[in-house]
UniProtKB/Swiss-Prot annotation:
Interacts with CHP1 and CHP2. Plasma membrane Na(+)/H(+) antiporter. Mediates the electroneutral exchange of intracellular H(+) ions for extracellular Na(+). Major apical Na(+)/H(+) exchanger in the base of the colonic crypt. Controls in the colonic crypt intracellular pH (pHi) to direct colonic epithelial cell differentiation into the absorptive enterocyte lineage at the expense of the secretory lineage. One of its GO terms (cellular component) is membrane. InterPro entries: Cation/H_exchanger_CPA1, Cation/H_exchanger_TM, NaH_exchanger, NHE-2/4, NHE_CaM-bd. It is a multi-pass membrane protein. It comes from Homo sapiens (Human). The chain crosses the membrane at residues 80-100, 107-127, 138-158, 169-189, 209-229, 237-257, 278-298, 308-328, 361-381, 392-412, 430-450, 459-479. The keyword Heme does not apply. Expressed in skeletal muscle, colon and kidney. Lower levels in the testis, prostate, ovary, and small intestine. In the distal colon, expressed along the cryptal axis. Glycans are attached at N350. This is Sodium/hydrogen exchanger 2. Residues 648-701, 733-812 are annotated as: Disordered.
């Protein structure tokens, strides 16, 4: 018996995990799964002495000897990750199948199709096993599936329209949620007082709690529907922003009423504490999100040597903000939204382009997978035995949800329109009220109710599922035809060009200046103040210095400098026609506008002049938004190529004589009142005294000097001996020179020279008066022949005897 005693002494302190390892190595293959499941339980509960069969002799092993298996099946070992992978694969294949037929997602929202797939799977599971399918746990929803969706929504949210409408969004989210919660709760409590319905055991606080959770407008359902109808940006940001902040308010009200239901007596101080908790939860979540967003930006400032881990910080800090807020019982939705918006502004400038692309794709992938799993599990969890049907409670719940939602939107809009520059129209109000879709937030909160405190929990679950399915299926399917029927303004699908964005920024600065002069503190005023504070403090602290510029922009800068040097060397600058000279030559016949057209123009201006400009495209979950810097760089490169192509084409159209003259001429532009060297000043005096310029020539704004000497020719009637170069006034038509025409022009008469005046201006502005140029245009304008621009009076260095003008005769 001594060996048995030795075995007992060895077996007593043996850890259970070591026994499991021994079972895996030496146990029979067929009984491996059963051994893994039952071995710890048998070890922990067995207290009987071992049987004689278990006693082993010295030198023998405890287990029977087994051979090496060829094939082994161990499903319990990988059950959880295997099933999760299959669910995600099934959801992804379902989405691929929906989008194979392009017309199906435009008719039926994707959320409806996913719920139908979940209902089908739940029915199959319930029919085979005759048990309720596994319901999604609320902790799994709130801790793992909801954060990626909110992170994606906050990170890619158009921040400027959001902050321009922040007052209206908070008005709908806070006051509107209180309106709906209290209205639905009190109305349902009135229905419960009717004894015929059998609902007298439901108290007022329970109805208020149910009203708060049923008022949750789900951003997942809203995004799934509104991404396909492409409404205008203002309407989209109002509905989406309200649904995002509405969830945070709903969760706060839910926890508040849940705490009241668990109290035996409620005092006045508890009510004030609940109101204070309402603001603390929301503001605390925002502060946590902004703080961790700043830390993320500061961390990525030092990752320029380790680019691989840059995307990791974005997801870690955002998820850390969510779980930190939940740890302190603050609003995790507000925290992760604020963190995402902060990182979008600062982190993007620190990370590389490849890291930014990784962040975008991975974030879109996580949110799409989470959204798909939520809708499928909603359908699966619907099928089961956890329902209680009551016609009165279910029907009145649906009616009160629709009624209080519509009343709340119309009443609150009448108040907020008094403070809005752009009032919301009746069509916008109707779409906002119609877009109050319920979804996963409401579904998870109703399953989270404790059954001990709420004996009619199954009735609440049934009513919530009916409201969710009605809003997602009926309202979600019919909202697109309604938008088309009401002719609601759609989103602008055209991307802004670089010039348009420059003009938009110019208008912003102008409006900021106007507000500053008027003493009005509007959006532009506060945006300008924040930008100054951001440039002075935040960007210096959070953004890495010596940021590398885009290679395309640097290449464009080098090409422009090289092209400018070539133009200066070849004299092409002096021959390029100016906009002012072309504009003076162009005569357009403007048709008189009729009174009906004038009224139509006024109506269009009054409707669209002060509208918020469409700066971004509508949200689309299945495609990524174009990067602004990449689009601008591409446009700059395209414009550069186009300008080079036009310059080459224009240069090739010049005749050979003009090319020869421009290649040998050198022009120098001097500003007004520039002191010339003594020799040049002497020559200019001789030229003016010679009668080749008028008194107004001395007041010219710009002097163009041709420094290339021409052929020397002398006229005896002007000079008795050979004299050095002097400066003469020449008439030069820039448009004819540029277009390569050989049409001779008549030199101006002395009378016209005396009549013409020079105006101070830039190098390429016309130097003739309007009357003189107009008279010449009348003579030259004929049908089918474009008008000739007026000649241009310039200083030119030439030989005194040279009377040959560029556009004149050589007669002495």
């Amino acid at each position: 018996m001594e060996p048995l005693g030795n075995w007992r002494s060895l077996r007593a302190p043996l850890p259970p995990m070591l026994l499991l390892l021994l079972l895996q190595v030496a146990g029979p293959v067929g009984a491996l799964a059963e051994t893994l499941l039952n071995a710890p339980r048998a070890m922990g509960t067995s207290s009987s002495p071992p049987s004689p069969a278990s006693v082993v002799a010295p030198g023998t092993t405890l287990f029977e000897e087994s051979r090496l298996p060829v094939f082994t099946l161990d499903y319990p070992h990988v059950q959880i990750p295997f099933e999760i992978t299959l669910w995600i694969l099934l959801a992804s294949l379902a989405k691929i199948g929906f989008h194979l037929y392009h017309k199906l997602p435009t008719i039926v929202p994707e959320s409806c199709l996913l719920i139908m797939v979940g209902l089908l799977l739940g029915g199959i599971i319930f029919g085979v096993d005759e048990k309720s399918p596994p319901a999604m746990k609320t902790d799994v929803f709130f801790l793992y599936l909801l954060p990626p969706i909110v992170l994606d929504a906050g990170y890619f949210m158009p921040t400027r329209p959001f902050f321009e409408n922040i007052g209206t969004i908070f008005w709908y989210a806070v006051v509107g949620t209180l309106w709906n919660s209290i209205g639905i709760g009190v109305s349902l409590f009135g229905i419960c007082q009717i004894e015929a319905f059998g609902l007298s055991d439901i108290t007022l606080l329970q109805n208020l709690l149910f009203g708060s959770l049923i008022s949750a407008v789900d951003p997942v359902a809203v995004l799934a529907v509104f991404e396909n109808i492409h409404v205008n940006e203002q309407l989209y940001i109002l509905v989406f922003g309200e649904s995002l902040l509405n969830d945070a308010v709903t969760v706060v009200l839910y926890n508040l009423f849940k705490s009241f239901c668990q109290m035996k007596t409620i005092e006045t101080i508890d009510v004030f504490a609940g109101i204070a908790n309402f603001f603390v939860v929301g503001i605390g979540g925002v502060l946590i999100g902004i703080f961790l967003g700043f830390i993320a930006a500061f961390t990525t400032r030092f990752t320029h040597n380790i680019r691989v881990i840059e995307p990791l910080f974005v997801f870690l800090y955002s998820y850390l903000s969510y779980i930190t807020a939940e740890m302190f019982h603050l609003s995790g939705i507000m925290a992760i939204t604020a963190c995402a918006m902060t990182m979008n502004k600062y982190v993007e400038e620190n990370v590389s382009q490849k890291s930014y692309t990784t962040i975008k794709y991975f974030m879109k992938m996580l949110s799409s997978v989470s959204e798909t799993l939520i809708f499928i599990f909603m359908g699966v969890s619907t099928v089961g035995k956890n329902h209680e049907w009551n016609w009165a409670f279910v029907c009145f719940t649906l009616a009160f949800c629709l009624m209080w939602r519509a009343l709340g939107v119309f009443v609150l809009t009448q108040v907020i329109n008094r403070f809005r520059t752009i009032p919301l129209t009746f069509k916008d109000q109707f779409i906002i009220a119609y877009g109050g879709l319920r979804g996963a937030i409401c579904f998870a909160l109703v399953f989270l109710l404790p059954a001990a405190v709420f004996p009619r929990k199954k009735l609440f679950i049934t009513a919530a599922i009916v409201v969710i399915f009605f809003t997602v299926f009926i309202l979600g399917i019919t909202i697109r035809p309604l938008v088309e029927f009401l002719d609601v303004k759609r989103s602008n699908k055209k991307q802004q060009a670089v010039s348009e964005e420059i003009y938009c920024r110019l208008f912003d600065h102008v409006k900021t200046g106007i507000e500053d002069v008027c003493g009005h503190w509007g959006h532009n005023f506060w945006r300008d103040k924040f930008k100054k504070f951001d440039d002075k403090y935040l960007r210096k602290l959070l953004i890495r210095e010596n940021q590398p510029k885009s290679s395309i922009v640097s290449l464009y800068k080098k090409l422009e400098i090289k092209h400018a040097i070539e133009m200066a060397e070849t004299g092409m600058i002096s021959t390029v026609p100016t906009f002012a000279s072309l504009n003076d030559c162009r005569e357009e016949k403007i048709r008189k506008v009729t009174s009906s057209e004038t009224d139509e123009i006024r109506e269009l201006l009054s409707r669209n002049l002060y509208q918020i400009r469409q700066r971004t495209l509508s949200y689309n979950r299945h495609s990524l938004t174009a990067d602004t810097s990449e689009r601008q760089a591409k446009e700059i490169l395209i414009r550069r190529r186009h300008s080079l192509r036009e310059s080459i084409r224009k240069d090739s159209s010049l005749n050979r004589e003009h090319r020869a003259s421009t290649s040998t001429s050198r022009y120098l532009s001097l500003p007004k009142n520039t002191k010339l060297p003594e020799k040049l000043q002497k020559r200019r005096t001789i030229s003016i005294a010679d009668g080749n310029s008028s008194d107004s020539d001395a007041d010219a704004g710009t002097t163009v000097l041709n420094l290339q000497p021409r052929a020397r020719r002398f006229l005896p009637e002007q000079f008795s001996k050979k004299s050095p170069q002097s400066y003469k006034m020449e008439w030069k038509n820039e448009v004819d020179v540029d277009s390569g025409r050989d049409m001779p022009s008549t030199p101006p008469t002395p009378h016209s020279r005396e009549k013409g005046t020079q105006t101070s201006g830039l190098l390429q502005q016309p130097l003739l008066s309007k009357d003189q140029s107009g008279s010449e245009r009348e003579d030259s304008l004929t049908e089918g022949i474009p008008p000739k621009p007026p000649p241009r009076l310039v200083w030119r260095a030439s030989e005194p005897g040279s009377r040959k003008a560029r556009f004149g005769s050589e007669k002495p």
